[in-house]
């Protein structure tokens, strides 16, 4: 019914609060489609997670820019958001509220996305239980790896993929 990547995103979003991982999960899924067939709403959800990542790190400028972009994209994707089991109106209200918190440099607070499809939420809760996560748990603000994951993660795979892409481009030019 829903893509596994989307359920994984929601689980990370609401249980571990690992917004960096949310971004990784959905970006990888989004890139599975050919460039001209990629869905904008996935970008909106990716940017929502990254905006919260920056907000939690007190990067106000980055959080504000990404949240504004996310709102703009998801505002235009009413049908897709609803088809993904969320309440579009409540989602936009929530995002606008977070945007205002960012704008006034208020402290980060964990949020719960307005899931209206009970079966979707149950699927997420089941996945949480399998992983021994707690659904709806607030962000662990003392977890430095969670807060600064972009700097502390192992980048070996990322570097290797970039090198492969450079080689592919060189070969395609020859």
From Swiss-Prot:
The gene is ypuF. InterPro entries: DUF309 (IPR005500), TTHA0068_sf (IPR023203). This is Uncharacterized protein YpuF. Signal peptide: none annotated. It comes from Bacillus subtilis (strain 168).
């Amino acid at each position: 019914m829903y893509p596994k990547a989307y359920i994984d995103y929601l689980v990370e979003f609401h249980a571990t609060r690992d917004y960096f991982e949310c971004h990784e999960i959905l970006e990888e899924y989004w890139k599975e489609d050919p460039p001209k067939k990629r869905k904008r709403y996935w970008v909106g959800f990716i940017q929502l997670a990254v905006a919260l990542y920056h907000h939690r790190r007190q990067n106000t400028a980055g959080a504000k820019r990404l949240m504004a972009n996310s709102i703009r994209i998801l505002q235009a994707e009413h049908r897709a958001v609803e088809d993904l089991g969320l309440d579009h109106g409540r989602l936009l209200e929530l995002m606008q509220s977070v945007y205002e918190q960012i704008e006034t440099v208020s402290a980060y607070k964990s949020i719960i996305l307005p899931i209206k499809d009970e079966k979707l939420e149950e699927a997420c809760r089941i996945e949480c239980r399998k992983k021994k996560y707690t659904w709806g748990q607030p962000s662990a603000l003392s977890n430095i790896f969670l807060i600064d994951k972009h700097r502390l993660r192992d980048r070996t795979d990322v570097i290797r993929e970039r090198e492969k892409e450079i080689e592919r481009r060189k070969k395609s030019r020859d």
